[in-house]
Amino acid sequence: MVMTDEMMEIIESSRAYVATATTNGVPNVVPIGFIKPLDNKTVLIADSYMVKSRANLEANPKLAFVVQDAAKYPYQFKGSVEIFESGEYFDQVVEWVKETNPLAPKPKAAILITIEEVYSVKVGDAGKKIA
Ligand SMILES: Cc1cc2nc3c(=O)[nH]c(=O)nc-3n(C[C@H](O)[C@H](O)[C@H](O)COP(=O)(O)O)c2cc1C
């Protein structure tokens, strides 16, 4: 799956609502500000505050998200995650958060998402797989 330039631009510039689930299917959704694409297949999240989301991802490394303005950008992204508490991706989120807000706490982890599927949530073709 490859994201379009428009998809990458809107992820870069927008908040997202990120859904995870426990292994027995209890859903959880949170707003996330520190989310950005690294390339057309991967998206990075700074985990600074995740509790249930993080526990869910440790046990069930799958998530889905939509961007805040889903009326204008009606995409539902789904992917698998890897969690890094050190190394290149971790250093990248630490620097990113520090540059954006020097008063923000140091992130606990980098969450790297490999995008696997994108669906439309647009009224009319809602639910259609688009990539
Ligand atoms: C506007 C907004 C932006 C947020 N951005 C982030 C973020 O970038 N990273 C993060 O770890 N938590 C962020 N949070 C906190 C999470 O939404 C949430 O409170 C946290 O993951 C704990 O919830 P959980 O136990 O369901 O994971 C943000 C919260 C709000 C209200």
Regions found by a protein language model. Give the residues of each.
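Binding-site signature for planar aromatic cofactors or substrates
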Residues: 1-131
